[in-house]
Amino acid sequence: MLLTFPDSPFQLNQPFPPAGDQPAAIEQLVEGLSDGLSYQTLLGVTGSGKTYTMANVIARTGRPAIIMAHNKTLAAQLYSEMREFFPHNAVEYFVSYYDYYQPEAYVPSRDLFIEKDSSINEHIEQMRLSATKSILERPDCIIVATVSAIYGIGDPSDYHQMILHLKEGETTPQRDIISRLTTMQYSRNDLDFGRGTFRVRGDVIDIYPAESSDTALRVSLFDDEVETLTLFDPLTGTTKQRVGRYTVFPSSHYVTPRDTVLRACEQIKDELRHRIEWYQKEGKLVEAQRIEQRTRFDLEMLYEMGFCKGIENYSRHFSGRGPGDPPPTLIDYLPKNALMFIDESHVTVPQVGAMYKGDAARKANLVEYGFRLPSAADNRPLKFHEFEQLMPQTIFVSATPAVYEKDHAGQVVEQVVRPTGLVDPEIEIRPVATQVDDLLSEIRERMARGERVLVTTLTKRMAEQLADYYTEHGVKVRYLHSDIDTVERVEIIRDLRLGMFDVLIGINLLREGLDIPEVSLVAILDADKEGFLRSERSLIQTIGRAARNLRGKALLYADRITDSMRKAMDETERRRAKQMAFNAEHGIVPKGVEKKIKDIIDGVYSVEAERKKLVDEAAVAMMDEKTLSKEIKRLEKEMMEAARNLEFERAARIRDELKQLKEKAWLSDL
């Protein structure tokens, strides 16, 4: 059911009306915003529907919003949920576009210079460009971002200057359009038409906007007049619709007008001269020669091409900022009436504060030893006090607010009662001596009921040994650790939900915001070892992972009750009592959370398809040698036929099946 609110551009898809503590929380937060409170805190327990409350606040106030999360996995989960709540509004995703990133660095002790090396994810880059386009074009915009939002991107005023407006009936020579596209960092490619390129055929210019994944623009000219503007599918060429006007946005956040580049080059030359003089005065001749050689090469590239490798290190000169001024970031693109939500704020806020310090330490060596000019230090993330100055009206969202949120809370809004009636997990304390075998018997009980288990240990070594031990005893177990990349982490969590394994072991990766309703047992090993992994906040967060299940239970293995354990148990008990009183008063029978299993960024996973895949794998495992050989020959023939008929996708699918069968055949030959 789609709901609209007065003076709000948002259409909220409301699968159910707010319940439990949600109506009061929504009302208090909206009231706090209209009263002009700069900061508020939503203290919401796991499973109380904090994301739904955020969506309601955005829809009712009608203001654009940015939601910040502390990692890509949680940001992707929030993005997916917000897209469901706002199917007709601009919900965008802004995270770091690097799949791999090795920053430039110098290690003086080994005289080792490490070149910058990175691999950019095209899909995420397109989503980032789409995010800035939506902010500039639409009032109904919601951006889900990570701390990537505090890193410098192009100056909004330069970005605005570079936008190309096209309108039917307008006089614009073809040469001017091509020239503008080139300065916007679009490249001409008449053969391979992809994102960020354009092609020219007679009087027709086809432009593939950098922020679009499936729509291109065809500009048909009659002499110097724009005759028609048409949107079409770049793959099939099918016309989608004719438009009267269209705005083409730059191909990168870092585009710069030509006169700005020339002005910046003069400033860089000036800084270089001063720096060489300083090195010579200090007797550092190697550094003087190094900085001159590197900077002159970059200047040559800037004059000829308009950009160079590592152009971000000269960003201060391009944006015209003074030394030490904050860089332009995504937050500068936000309209003045924007809202900010900081999800899992007890982790996200400290993370924002830590970003600048790490970056500054690395840059200091590069500047000192002549690899970069001093202005490179101003290509940096925001300092915490700069971030605070830019923050619009902000709502901190957390089950366990930290000191910063408590000090800055205009009001604290509690959302402790769950609409589903689910009660916080029951907590049991058991001795450490028998923890491994005791947990094994509990796991078997859960496996028999088709439920899942999360186990948190203190060290990687303990997690690995535990995973090996349980595997030997016939338990399907996986181990989650910091070396696993974002995409694989999402897949592991999805596989746990699908039942491809029953137990997930981790260290501190099980804490914030993992939404796994199938988990009925959380086990915390060595719970009495005080430290940040066993602090009151960590324990409450970890216990909360079982709060989405009807039979949720938390086992704390400890020989004594620490202060942190006592506080976590008291807080959980307080929440249990409040929920049970609410259930009794309203006659609510608790029911488990049912949640579709989604591909966090691209939509919804088909459980049936996954199960079919598992069945197919099992069928392969059952084949004898003769059947296997026959099946391989049949598939090879089918694959060649598909390739001859130009059915390449089908051929690729068969090839993957063949690979699986050949692996099985090879293993059986051993």
Curated annotation (Swiss-Prot):
Give UniProt keywords alphabetically. Answer: ATP-binding, Cytoplasm, DNA damage, DNA excision, DNA repair, Excision nuclease, Nucleotide-binding, SOS response
Q: Which residue numbers delimit the Helicase C-terminal domain?
A: 435-601
Major site of localization recorded for this protein: cytoplasm
Q: Name one GO biological process term.
A: nucleotide-excision repair
Where the record annotates domain Helicase ATP-binding, the positions are 31-418
Question: Which residue ranges does the record assign to the UVR domain?
Answer: 629-664
Q: Where in the cell is it found?
A: Cytoplasm
Gene Ontology molecular functions: ATP binding; ATP hydrolysis activity; DNA binding; excinuclease ABC activity
Provide the residue positions that the database annotates as binding ATP: 44-51
GO CC terms, sorted: cytoplasm; excinuclease repair complex
Entry-linked InterPro entries: Helicase/UvrB_N (IPR006935), Helicase_ATP-bd (IPR014001), Helicase_C-like (IPR001650), P-loop_NTPase (IPR027417), UVR_dom (IPR001943), UVR_dom_sf (IPR036876), UvrB (IPR004807), UvrB_inter (IPR041471)
- Supply the Pfam families for this chain: Helicase_C, ResIII, UVR, UvrB, UvrB_inter
Ranges spanned by the short sequence motif Beta-hairpin, renumbered to the chain: 97-120
PROSITE patterns attached to this UniProt entry: HELICASE_ATP_BIND_1, HELICASE_CTER, UVR
What is the annotated quaternary arrangement, including any partners?
Answer: Forms a heterotetramer with UvrA during the search for lesions. Interacts with UvrC in an incision complex.
Its annotated function is as follows:
The UvrABC repair system catalyzes the recognition and processing of DNA lesions. A damage recognition complex composed of 2 UvrA and 2 UvrB subunits scans DNA for abnormalities. Upon binding of the UvrA(2)B(2) complex to a putative damaged site, the DNA wraps around one UvrB monomer. DNA wrap is dependent on ATP binding by UvrB and probably causes local melting of the DNA helix, facilitating insertion of UvrB beta-hairpin between the DNA strands. Then UvrB probes one DNA strand for the presence of a lesion.
What the entry lists under HAMAP family is as follows: UvrB (MF_00204)
The Swiss-Prot or TrEMBL note on domains reads:
The beta-hairpin motif is involved in DNA binding.
Protein family: Belongs to the UvrB family.
Q: What protein name is recorded for this chain?
A: UvrABC system protein B
